[in-house]
């Protein structure tokens, strides 16, 4: 789970997993990565909630490089964008800038974009936010509210589907790379 401080990452982790992270309405409630597990039939996904990233996190500000290092091992980035923030598109761009400047391929990882706290804005505001981020990112955007349980099942379905597809692609790539020799 990736985003600015107070974007709703811990609330989402708590809403869709068995984790009970500390949740507060102030930045830096999460100080260390928190883990939770989503189970779906015979599959499970481990979600990692990392502390919020701030400007210049890639330089180590707010011990950002330590947090970014944790997501190097993640297969997919769940990018939360707070609907209630003054400029959600700018917030999205800031996080993309930080993971790009950090390097190590983070910007190339698959992402699921989620507008969080959707219950706190009007439908009209939400449509504008979604449109702006979809146009900029060239990706579809999910809408959620952890408190009101909006969009959570869809998010879980998308996450399992994307991970299965990614695992299949990686398995096919590994099979092609292995050469048989008697």
Language-model regions, residue ranges each:
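C-terminal-of-GTPase-core extension/linker across diverse P-loop GTPases
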Residues: 1-2, 7, 86-93, 97-182
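Conserved G1/Walker A P-loop phosphate-binding module
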Residues: 1-61, 65-76, 81, 156-157
């Amino acid at each position: 789970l990736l985003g600015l401080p107070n974007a709703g990452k811990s609330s989402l982790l708590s809403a869709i997993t068995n984790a009970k992270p500390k949740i507060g309405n102030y930045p830096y409630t999460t100080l260390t990565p928190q883990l939770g597990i989503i189970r779906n039939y015979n599959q499970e996904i481990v979600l990692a909630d990392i502390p919020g990233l701030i400007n210049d996190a890639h330089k180590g500000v707010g011990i950002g490089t330590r947090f970014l290092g944790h997501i190097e091992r993640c297969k997919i980035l769940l990018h939360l964008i707070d609907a209630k923030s003054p400029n959600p598109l700018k917030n999205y761009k800031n996080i993309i800038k930080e993971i790009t400047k950090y390097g190590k391929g983070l910007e190339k990882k698959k992402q699921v974009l989620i507008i969080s706290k959707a219950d706190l804005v009007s439908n009209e505001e939400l449509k504008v936010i979604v449109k702006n981020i979809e146009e900029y990112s060239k990706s579809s955007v999910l809408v959620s509210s952890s408190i009101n349980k909006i969009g959570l099942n869809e998010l879980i379905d998308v996450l399992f589907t994307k991970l299965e597809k990614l695992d299949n692609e990686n398995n096919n790539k590994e099979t092609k790379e292995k050469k048989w020799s008697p």
